[in-house]
A protein has these predicted regions:
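A generic structural motif
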Residues: 241, 346, 400-401, 434-438
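Conserved PLP-enzyme active-site core in the AAT-like
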Residues: 72-78, 88, 108, 126-129, ...
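Short glycine-rich or small-residue beta-strand-to-loop segments that form or flank ligand, phosphate
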Residues: 124, 151-153, 235-238, 395, ...
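Conserved small-domain helix->loop->beta segment predominantly found in fold-type I
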Residues: 352-434, 455-480
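N-terminal chloroplast transit peptides
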Residues: 1-48
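N-terminal entrance/gating region of PLP-dependent enzymes' catalytic architecture
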Residues: 48-136, 140-143, 509-511, 526, ...
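PLP-dependent enzyme catalytic core of the Aspartate aminotransferase-like
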Residues: 411-415, 420-558
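Short acidic (Asp/Glu) and glycine-rich catalytic loops that position anionic groups and cofactors
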Residues: 317-321, 339-348, 387-392, 422-428, ...
């Protein structure tokens, strides 16, 4: 074939790709024609109704009765079509659609994922300026979750929380938040220059578990700021908590909105809420302005994939977009993005029944395990902030067996292959999801029965372990510098003994659950040090500290 003919034979297939960057609807439809899904002139599609019933000029790709039963979600379809092109790829990433993939990695995951590990090609849209399949995927997610707008996140819920706080709080503003918030909320205050107004959640002494925050606590915090001549820029609520405890968001949102204060909900553990009558209501249905959900935790997206949802007019959407563009990678992984689209579609296809089996298995497991001698099941802790609990989060107490949660977890993992999600001093927590099988439940029950039968082999928990209030380290939080000031201040290293009373210069956080105990700018207390040393001795991993042995700390030079 002559060079002229060669040029002509390929021109029709590939010139349209490289001449239309950024995304252009008319030219990007070709790769999706095979599936009957085109963004522009679309087969089996009609114009859609926009948010709040306003007619939209966009064309919806939502499947209708005439559409193929095998129709793929928009971003999944676009990624599949692009990967199937017979392309001569002179673009990133360097493995070149798997042709140069490391053999050790292909032995682990095969070669197919590399075909779909593509950059922001024109037909795949742009995460930060979406016009095509990403835009459509996010719109479909917004409709499913009840948002006016949804953003896909490839930096986990961490970047979603950071963006939400940066979009609502400016330097010097005050954010009301629980003292046991995730590390992402603390890093957000460093990034934004926001000042914290902490609420200390109620604490269940028997379980060594913190609850959510109450409407009365939020109201009190707002009033205290008003007496100081200040107004909260936003309120952050963690609901559900890692243990599945849900706050009364309906009342909290009503209180905040009466003061024109937006409510951000860290709903990382609750992307599934509202999709079954036995599940608690979602935060958006209760009035939250912003909700950040880890779609990978209970739903079926890939790890690190999350969503940020918005509704109402108290938050500037453009500021959210600008914040996300600063915080997220400029080279987002399209497998992560496509997994969000696929997880949304999976729920949409069978939203009324998809959680039936999972909930039944969780309730069955709780019923069987609650009858085992010496075992406690977290259902109704003794505090008022316990408004609701997620039935798919199951916390088992083992202190009556003379075991710590860390010891019980070690036995279950080594002897029964049961892997827990969260381990505490007195309990361990299990996360049920759509992939939970009956065999998993049977192994769990057998393992817990074994713990009970062999309890005579264990020494009773020491009184200082049984009776200590581990949440007491948050009782006397004193801030000498803002988190941002302390983060950038000059530091010096001192021994743990000499650190008492000094200003903490680092963020010290046991993980899981990722709740910081010492934050830059706070005075180091004996209670905080005692808790960190004890939980580390029980097997927790301490993150953030320059000295992971905790023999020394970084403190601020004043």
């Amino acid at each position: 074939m002559s060079s002229a003919n060669l040029d002509m034979s390929f021109a029709g297939n590939f010139c349209r790709k490289w001449s239309c960057r950024p995304f252009r609807r008319p030219k990007s439809c070709i790769s999706q024609e095979r599936n009957g899904i085109m963004l522009g002139k679309i087969k089996n599609c009609t114009s859609s109704v926009g948010y709040n019933g306003v007619p939209s000029t966009e064309i919806s790709c939502a499947p209708n009765a005439a559409a193929s039963q095998n129709e793929l979600p928009p971003l999944v379809s676009a990624l599949k079509a692009s990967a199937e092109e017979n392309a001569a790829s002179f673009h990133f990433p360097g493995h070149n659609r798997g042709k140069a993939a490391p053999s050790s990695l292909t032995q682990l995951i095969g070669s197919k994922p590399f075909l779909h590990d593509l950059p922001e090609l024109p037909e795949l849209d742009n995460l930060f300026s979406p016009e095509g399949p990403i835009l459509e995927a996010q719109k479909q997610a917004a409709r499913l979750f009840g948002a006016s707008e949804t953003w896909f996140l490839v930096g986990g819920s961490t970047c979603g929380i950071q963006a939400a706080i940066m979009a609502t709080c400016s330097p010097g503003d005050t954010l009301i938040l629980p003292r046991n918030s995730h590390i992402s909320a603390i890093s957000s205050m460093v990034l934004s220059g926001t000042l914290p107004k902490y609420i200390v959640p109620e604490y269940d002494f028997n379980w060594d578990v913190a609850g959510g925050i109450t409407p009365s606590q939020v109201h009190k915090a707002i009033k205290e700021l008003e007496m100081e001549g200040r107004k909260a820029a936003a309120v952050l609520v963690v609901s559900p908590t890692y243990h599945g405890i849900c706050s009364n968001l309906d009342e909290i949102c009503e209180i905040c909105h009466s003061h024109s204060i937006p409510v951000i909900v860290d709903e990382a553990h609750g992307a599934h809420l509202g999709f079954h009558l036995k599940l608690p209501s979602s935060s958006l249905s209760q009035g939250a302005d912003l909700s950040v959900q880890s779609t990978h935790k209970v739903l079926c997206a890939l790890t690190q994939s999350s969503m940020l949802h918005m509704q109402g007019n108290l938050v500037d959407r453009e500021r959210i977009s600008r914040s996300l563009q600063m915080l997220q990678s400029s080279s987002p992984n399209y497998l992560l993005l496509a997994s969000l689209d696929a997880a949304r579609a999976q729920i949409s296809e069978n939203r009324e029944a998809i959680f039936y089996q999972t909930i039944d298995l969780a309730l069955e497991a709780k019923s069987l395990i609650s009858k085992i001698p010496g075992i406690s099941v977290l259902e109704f802790p003794g505090f008022s902030s316990f408004f609701h609990i997620d039935p798919l989060r199951f916390t088992i107490g083992v202190w009556q067996l003379g075991l710590s949660g860390f010891e019980a977890d070690d036995i279950l993992c080594k002897d029964f292959g049961v892997v827990c999600e969260l381990v505490g001093t007195k309990s361990f927590t299990l996360a049920f999801n759509l992939g939970t099988q009956r065999d998993h439940v049977l192994r769990l029950v057998a393992g817990v029965k074994h713990l009970s039968k062999t309890s005579h082999l264990h020494q009773p928990l020491k009184d200082e372990v049984k009776n200590v209030n581990h949440f007491a380290c948050f009782d006397d939080v004193r801030m000498s510098m803002s988190p941002r000031e302390a983060f950038f201040a000059e530091k010096r290293k001192v021994s743990i003994r000499d650190s008492l009373g000094e200003i903490c210069g680092e963020l010290v956080c046991p993980y899981p659950p990722g709740i910081p105990v010492l934050i830059p700018g706070e005075i180091i207390t004996e209670k905080a040090l005692s808790y960190l040393l004890e939980i580390r001795s029980k097997g927790a991993v301490i993150t953030g500290a320059a000295d992971c042995s905790l023999s020394s700390f970084l403190v601020c030079v004043t």
